[in-house]
């Protein structure tokens, strides 16, 4: 799990500091980096669907405001709440299997139990609603009030999503097996990528800093766990990092607009 960071001035490894005229790059771990991303996509979809059901308790199902398209409230709320619920569930289960069960691959159990549980909950809620309502309910009755305004909003958030995605992948991306990061932020990415890989390629439970063994974590790390878990599920690191970052920022802008 060695990472090689080459800047315009120095080459950093986990054991040495070498003068180098090279470019900024990080050699990518060639495990799940080359794998499929389907399980990672399923994870995000399950999180969004679970969050949609849970967030209705906060946003109020069936409520509507004249002229306001509440879909821009529902979408980010679903993503945010769902990611929190599913990711914490997977982390706690994985922690239990690692610390108590002494499992060598705790994320396997965490993801199987967490994702299966989320799917079961979603199915049970859907069946219960279908029976209570006596059929399928029109999904957009309370979420879309102004269709003319909706077209402009879709254009706005579509352009924002394209720009933010470009910005994220411009700074952090993988090309030919090499993980590149921006000139002014590569130093910050070193501990972040190490934390991600400590989950996707390691067993960092109880969680501690990869760079400072034995010290408990005093810095928020659940984003790194989420990204590492998505990479564990087969999603390439840059996709995992940038997709979550893009969705989070676009969701924040949707809430700000709403």
Regions found by a protein language model. Name each.
Residues 2-4, 8-16, 22-147:
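Membrane-embedded, hydrophobic transmembrane alpha-helices
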Residues 120, 159-160:
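Alpha-helical membrane-embedded segments
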Residues 64-67, 157, 238-239:
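Alpha-helical transmembrane segments of multi-pass membrane proteins
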Residues 160-258:
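Active-site lumenal/periplasmic loops and adjacent helix-entry segments of GT-C-fold
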Residues 41, 67, 155-156, 168, ...:
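Short secondary-structure boundary micro-motifs
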Residues 74, 149-158:
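Alpha-helical transmembrane segments and their helix-start/interface "positive-inside/aromatic belt" motifs
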């Amino acid at each position: 799990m060695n990472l090689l960071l080459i800047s315009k001035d120095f080459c950093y490894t986990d054991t040495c500091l070498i003068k180098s005229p090279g470019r900024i790059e990080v050699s990518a771990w060639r495990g799940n980096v080359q794998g499929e991303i389907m399980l990672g996509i399923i994870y995000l979809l399950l999180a969004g669907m679970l969050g949609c059901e849970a967030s209705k308790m906060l946003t109020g199902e069936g409520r509507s405001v004249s002229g306001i398209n509440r879909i821009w409230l529902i979408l980010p709320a679903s993503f945010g709440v769902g990611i929190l619920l599913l990711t914490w569930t997977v982390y706690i289960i994985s922690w239990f299997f690692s610390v108590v069960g002494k499992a060598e691959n705790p994320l396997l159990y965490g993801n199987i139990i967490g994702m299966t549980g989320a799917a079961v909950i979603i199915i049970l809620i859907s069946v219960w609603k279908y029976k209570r309502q006596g059929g399928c309910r029109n999904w957009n009755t309370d979420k879309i009030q102004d269709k003319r305004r909706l077209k402009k909003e879709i254009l706005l958030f579509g352009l924002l999503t394209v720009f933010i995605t470009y910005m994220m992948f411009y700074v952090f991306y993988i090309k030919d097996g090499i993980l590149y990061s921006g000139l002014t932020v590569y130093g910050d990415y070193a501990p972040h990528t190490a934390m991600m890989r400590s989950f996707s390629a390691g067993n960092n439970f109880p969680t501690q800093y990869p760079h400072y063994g034995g010290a408990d974590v005093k810095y928020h790390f659940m984003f790194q766990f989420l990204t590492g878990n998505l990479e564990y599920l087969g999603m390439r690191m840059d996709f995992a990092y940038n997709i979550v970052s893009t969705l989070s920022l676009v969701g924040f802008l949707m809430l700000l607009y709403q």
